[in-house]
C-alpha cells in the first residue's frame, strides 16, 4: 500500500506529464488560414479590464483577424460576478480599439462556461463552417474537443500563449475539467 506522500508524489508526476503533453500539443498546431469564423472563448474580466488569460486570447484573435481579413469572429462570454461588462463586450472593445471592423465581430453574451461558449456560439453561426477555436494553450484541447462534440464538422485549434506562475493552478484544474467533461459527455 502506498503512503500518503508516495500517492502525492505520483499525482504530481501524472499532472506534470499531462501538462507537458497539453503544451506540446498546443505548440505543434499547424496554421489554418482563411477560416470562415473563429470563436474566441471567454475568460474572467475584472470590471471592464481583460485579465491576462483573456488578453492573450484576444491578442491571438487580433493577429488572426489581421492575417485573414475575410474571417469573422464570435466573441463568447457572458457577465459573471465582479464583471461590469460581458466578456464578449470586453473583447469587442479591445479588437475595435486595435482596428478590427465591428461588422466582423459577433457577440455571444449568455455563456458561463466552455461548453456553453461553444454550444451558443455554434448555434449562432451554424455547424457547416470552417471554425477556429481561440483559447489559451492549456485550454485548446478541451475547447476543440467540446466543439467537435457539439457537431462542428470542420474545427481547428488556434492556441494563444499563456506564461504565468498561475499555470500551476490552471493546468491541474484543466486536467480535472477534461475528466469531468468526458464523464458528462461534453467531449
Feature-to-residue mapping (PLM):
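N-terminal low-complexity segments that are often proline-rich with Ser/Thr-Pro
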Residues: 4-7
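A structural signal for short, hydrophobic/glycine-enriched beta-strand patches
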Residues: 19-171
Amino acid at each position: 500500500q502506498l503512503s500518503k506522500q508516495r500517492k502525492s508524489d505520483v499525482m504530481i508526476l501524472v499532472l506534470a506529464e499531462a501538462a507537458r503533453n497539453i503544451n506540446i500539443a498546443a505548440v505543434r498546431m499547424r496554421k489554418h488560414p482563411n477560416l470562415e469564423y473563429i470563436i474566441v472563448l471567454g475568460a474572467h474580466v475584472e470590471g471592464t479590464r481583460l485579465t491576462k488569460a483573456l488578453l492573450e486570447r484576444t491578442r491571438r484573435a487580433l493577429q488572426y483577424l489581421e492575417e485573414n481579413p475575410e474571417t469573422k469572429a464570435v466573441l463568447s462570454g457572458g457577465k459573471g460576478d465582479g464583471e461590469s461588462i460581458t466578456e464578449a463586450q470586453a473583447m469587442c472593445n479591445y479588437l475595435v480599439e486595435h482596428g478590427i471592423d465591428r461588422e466582423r465581430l459577433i457577440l455571444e453574451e449568455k455563456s458561463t462556461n466552455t461548453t456553453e461558449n461553444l454550444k451558443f456560439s455554434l448555434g449562432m453561426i451554424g455547424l457547416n463552417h470552417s471554425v477556429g477555436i481561440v483559447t489559451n494553450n492549456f485550454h485548446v484541447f478541451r475547447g476543440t474537443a467540446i466543439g467537435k462534440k457539439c457537431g462542428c464538422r470542420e474545427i481547428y485549434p488556434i492556441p494563444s500563449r499563456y506564461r504565468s506562475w498561475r499555470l500551476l493552478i490552471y493546468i491541474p484544474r484543466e486536467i480535472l475539467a477534461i475528466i469531468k467533461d468526458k464523464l458528462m459527455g461534453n467531449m
